[in-house]
């Protein structure tokens, strides 16, 4: 193991490893239940703002823009704890979720399970109740 790898894996210096697009993957879970709420991406600015403010900030690949969770919907995330994985290319935030995490109005983005069916797969809705109407909130 190189000295650099050892420092990344065992050291106390936070040195996030951004991908070629300048992003790290972020997994957000509910601090109270442990449920996975969403998977998103952070650039350096989103990561710094999240650490500084205690609010979740992300980078939207589709909009190519920084955004604070809840800035439009009011469905915010207060960060209780942030962790990084062994090689510092992903972060996990444990949050107090206010309302829904998903832009579809659901508590979690993981509201469908994949089930085997006739050699293929199908989706089945689970925990899919909407907490808000996305058309009303986002004025689509």
Curated annotation (Swiss-Prot):
Signal peptide (UniProt feature, chain positions): none
Major localization class: cytoplasm
One of the record's GO molecular function terms: zinc ion binding
Keywords: Amino-acid biosynthesis, Cytoplasm, Histidine biosynthesis, Hydrolase, Magnesium, Metal-binding, Zinc
Catalytic activity: 1-(5-phospho-beta-D-ribosyl)-5'-AMP + H2O = 1-(5-phospho-beta-D-ribosyl)-5-[(5-phospho-beta-D-ribosylamino)methylideneamino]imidazole-4-carboxamide
Pathway assignment: Amino-acid biosynthesis; L-histidine biosynthesis; L-histidine from 5-phospho-alpha-D-ribose 1-diphosphate: step 3/9
Pfam families for this protein: PRA-CH
InterPro entries assigned to the protein according to its UniProt record, in alphabetical order: PRA-CH, PRib_AMP_CycHydrolase_dom, PRib_AMP_CycHydrolase_sf
Cofactor binding note: Binds 1 Mg(2+) ion per subunit.
Annotated positions binding Zn(2+): 86, 102, 109
GO biological process: L-histidine biosynthetic process
GO cellular component term, pick one: cytoplasm
Record's subunit section: Homodimer.
Entry similarity comment: Belongs to the PRA-CH family.
Record-linked PANTHER family: HISTIDINE BIOSYNTHESIS BIFUNCTIONAL PROTEIN, HISTIDINE BIOSYNTHESIS BIFUNCTIONAL PROTEIN HIS7
Function: Catalyzes the hydrolysis of the adenine ring of phosphoribosyl-AMP.
Protein name: Phosphoribosyl-AMP cyclohydrolase
